[in-house]
């Protein structure tokens, strides 16, 4: 749908003469305050101690951050505008089954707190991909880094453009004005202020996100008769879903899909994603990092609850006040904005507050992307090749990288404007890549016999499967003549006397189930991470064992999950040998506090480097203990 965007007081679309609600001056002021305050916070941290900044302070906030700001930043990083718009639309169209996603948050945050954080924190890393070099080799590290850069570069442009497009279509808010304003402001405070500025602006933006959604819930519930009436209307029309225990992984949303498939999605975000790992490592202690992960749990539940309540309030509102034909045909990501403009049109400033809430989600996501991309580029791709960089030049280069990625983001936003139907494919790339990266880290932490070749082949296979299923699913849906109807009884193409329960009953008999490759492509998106990470682990293990496992290689004990030695000690000796856990019938020393160091050439130094240097007479201190693993094959 083409939208005319001008300076006139009202806007119309090319396919309808209906006047679109517009922003008042007060709304623009409220939205502008978000940008100004975010910029002020960033510039404050940039100017504070100017001239005394270090690379560690710029990229890692000097590793002195407290639990609460890190927790709110962790929440804000992936609480994007897409989630703020998509969650309520999901509830409005398909019912409350989506709410069970909250069940996945417990394990999805408990596992990172007690498995990934201890390993990463005790290795004293800056980039999560440094772990891959310590565990495998430099080639695996570069593969992981390049994969992450591709994932984030594609996503951040779409994450900036998509909400701006939805806002423009509904309110007439100038598309490229919002894109440029957000991109430039985010670019400035991220490049100059570093991670500390990003974290503290995330705190501010999280509060704005909660406030904006809370206002919509309160005002909307008041207009339709209270939350009790909202729930009664939703229940009357079958919108309140029971627990769907169908184990079929090809059903889009069931309890098992949401509660367990969602765990793997959470692990790919909160376990191994550089943006989140960087925040854990910026904490002043390992305990603070773990507590910040705990603190995200109630915050995530509140965010999910508010998102779902907005969907229910929206449903009750449009049962009382009818939709216009344009709204009935609107894209799902526009429904919430139409609702907000209808609900708050007589309250100047409140539409601006919700838009500030919406773009707070975008700012937090994009700034995290800029900062994490600058960090991995500096640590994984530049530092090893230019080891003689002075502190001053390293700081300038780090800031330049963040600024450069900001320009790339604006460029990707422009590219996104020409993608058309491929836009959904670009958004899906973020989810496709997360699963294989999760599998790569799990392969290293839990399987001592995995070798570098197995890791690389496993990652490439996982990525191939991810793109095959993901893109195949998108193409299949686009080419399908009959799409599943939304389950809300108010859509223009459903009879008014049908409810969610009625449609749900009719669907099995009216819609044929896909077969063959079509069924394969219909795998629920929440199982993507589980499927792709499992593929990486399975293929990685098979290739590793076929190629001799860790034949004659030393294994840095700090790269293995600390509890794993105790668990493997319970296995028979023959199993321990096959898993590379015993060498020459002797116990292998377990050391979990082994810290990597940076050598003069910018590369990582661990116990293997120290051994070689000791043999060459370059160092005289004792070598740190390592695993020497035996030959292993099938």
From Swiss-Prot:
Subcellular location field: Cell membrane; Apical cell membrane
Pfam families linked to this entry: SSF
Keywords: Biotin, Cell membrane, Glycoprotein, Ion transport, Membrane, Sodium, Sodium transport, Symport, Transmembrane, Transmembrane helix, Transport
Gene Ontology CC annotations of this record: apical plasma membrane; basal plasma membrane; basolateral plasma membrane; brush border membrane; plasma membrane
TM segment ranges: 23-43, 65-85, 100-120, 142-162, 175-195, 207-227, 255-275, 295-315, 350-370, 403-423, 427-447, 455-475, 526-546
GO biological process: biotin import across plasma membrane; biotin metabolic process; biotin transport; iodide transmembrane transport; pantothenate transmembrane transport; sodium ion transport; transport across blood-brain barrier
Domain of life of the native organism: Eukaryota
Membrane topology designation: Multi-pass membrane protein
Main localization (coarse): membrane
Tissue/organ expression: Expressed in the jejunum (at protein level). Expressed in lung, skeletal muscle, heart, brain, kidney, intestine, liver, and placenta.
Glycosylation sites (chain numbering): 488, 497
Chemical reaction(s) catalysed: biotin(out) + 2 Na(+)(out) = biotin(in) + 2 Na(+)(in); (R)-pantothenate(out) + 2 Na(+)(out) = (R)-pantothenate(in) + 2 Na(+)(in); (R)-lipoate(out) + 2 Na(+)(out) = (R)-lipoate(in) + 2 Na(+)(in); iodide(out) + 2 Na(+)(out) = iodide(in) + 2 Na(+)(in)
GO terms, molecular function: amide transmembrane transporter activity; biotin transmembrane transporter activity; iodide transmembrane transporter activity; monocarboxylate:sodium symporter activity; pantothenate transmembrane transporter activity; pantothenate:sodium symporter activity; sodium-dependent multivitamin transmembrane transporter activity; sulfur compound transmembrane transporter activity
The family this protein is said to belong to: Belongs to the sodium:solute symporter (SSF) (TC 2.A.21) family.
Subunit structure: Interacts with PDZD11.
Function statement: Sodium-dependent multivitamin transporter that mediates the electrogenic transport of pantothenate, biotin, lipoate and iodide. Functions as a Na(+)-coupled substrate symporter where the stoichiometry of Na(+):substrate is 2:1, creating an electrochemical Na(+) gradient used as driving force for substrate uptake. Required for biotin and pantothenate uptake in the intestine across the brush border membrane. Plays a role in the maintenance of intestinal mucosa integrity, by providing the gut mucosa with biotin.
Domain characteristics, as noted in the entry: The C-terminal tail is important for biotin uptake as well as apical localization in polarized cells.
Protein name: Sodium-dependent multivitamin transporter
Annotated source species: Rattus norvegicus
Organism phylogeny: Eukaryota, Metazoa, Chordata, Craniata, Vertebrata
């Amino acid at each position: 749908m083409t939208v005319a965007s001008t300076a006139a007081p009202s806007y119309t679309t090319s396919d309808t003469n209906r006047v679109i609600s517009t922003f008042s001056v007060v709304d623009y002021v409220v939205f502008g305050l978000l940008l100004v305050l975010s910029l002020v916070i960033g510039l404050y941290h940039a100017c504070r101690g100017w001239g005394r900044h270090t690379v560690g302070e710029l990229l890692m906030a000097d590793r002195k951050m407290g639990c609460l700001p890190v927790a709110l930043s962790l929440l804000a990083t992936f609480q994007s505008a897409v989630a703020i718009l998509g969650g309520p639309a999901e509830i409005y169209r398909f019912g409350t089954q989506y709410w069970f996603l909250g069940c996945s948050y417990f394990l999805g945050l408990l596992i990172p707190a007690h498995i990934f954080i201890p390993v990463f924190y005790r290795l004293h890393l800056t980039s999560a991909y440094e772990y891959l070099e310590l565990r495998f080799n430099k080639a695996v590290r570069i593969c992981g880094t390049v994969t992450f850069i591709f994932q984030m570069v594609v996503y951040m442009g779409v994450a900036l453009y998509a909400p701006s497009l939805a806002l423009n279509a509904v309110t007439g808010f100038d598309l490229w004005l919002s894109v440029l304003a957000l991109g430039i402001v985010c670019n400035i405070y991220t490049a100059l202020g570093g991670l500390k500025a990003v974290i503290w602006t995330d705190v501010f933006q999280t509060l704005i996100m909660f406030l904006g959604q809370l206002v919509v819930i309160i005002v909307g519930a008041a207009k339709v008769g209270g939350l009790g009436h909202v729930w009664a209307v939703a229940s009357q029309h079958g919108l309140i879903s029971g627990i769907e225990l169908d184990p079929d992984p090809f059903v889009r949303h069931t309890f098992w899909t949401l509660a367990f498939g969602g765990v793997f999605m959470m692990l790919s975000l909160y376990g191994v994603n550089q943006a989140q790992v960087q925040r854990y490592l910026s904490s002043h202690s390992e305990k603070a990092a773990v507590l910040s992960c705990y603190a995200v749990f109630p915050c995530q539940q509140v965010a999910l609850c508010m998102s779902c309540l907005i969907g229910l309030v929206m449903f009750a509102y449009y049962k009382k006040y009818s939709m216009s034909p344009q709204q009935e045909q609107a894209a799902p990501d526009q429904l919430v904005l139409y609702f907000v403009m209808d609900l708050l049109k007589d309250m100047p400033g409140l539409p601006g507050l919700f838009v500030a809430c919406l773009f707070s989600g975008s700012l937090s996501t994009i700034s995290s992307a800029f900062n994490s991309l600058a960090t991995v580029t500096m640590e994984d791709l530049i530092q090893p090749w230019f080891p003689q960089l002075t502190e001053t030049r390293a700081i300038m280069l780090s800031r330049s990288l963040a600024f450069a990625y900001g320009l790339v983001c604006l460029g990707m936003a422009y590219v996104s404007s020409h993608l058309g139907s491929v836009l959904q494919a670009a958004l899906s790339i973020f989810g496709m890549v997360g699963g294989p990266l999760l599998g790569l880290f799990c392969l290293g932490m839990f399987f001592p016999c995995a070798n570098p070749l197995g890791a690389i082949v496993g990652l490439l296979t996982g990525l191939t499967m991810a793109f095959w299923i993901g893109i195949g699913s998108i193409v299949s849906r686009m080419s399908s003549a009959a799409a599943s109807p939304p389950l809300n009884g108010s859509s223009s193409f459903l009879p008014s006397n049908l409810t969610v329960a009625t449609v749900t009953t009719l669907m099995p008999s009216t819609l044929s189930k896909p077969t063959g490759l079509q069924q394969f492509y219909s795998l629920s998106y929440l199982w993507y991470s589980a499927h792709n990470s499992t593929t990486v682990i399975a293929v990685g293990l098979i290739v590793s064992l076929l190629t001799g496992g860790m034949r004659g290689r030393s294994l840095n004990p700090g790269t293995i999950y600390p509890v794993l030695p105790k668990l493997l000690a319970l296995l028979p000796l023959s199993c321990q040998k096959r898993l590379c856990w015993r060498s020459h019938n002797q116990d292998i020393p377990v050391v979990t506090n082994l810290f990597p160091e940076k050598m003069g050439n910018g590369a990582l130094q661990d116990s293997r480097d120290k051994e070689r240097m000791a043999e060459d007479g370059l160092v005289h201190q004792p070598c740190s203990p390592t695993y020497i693993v035996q030959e292993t094959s099938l």
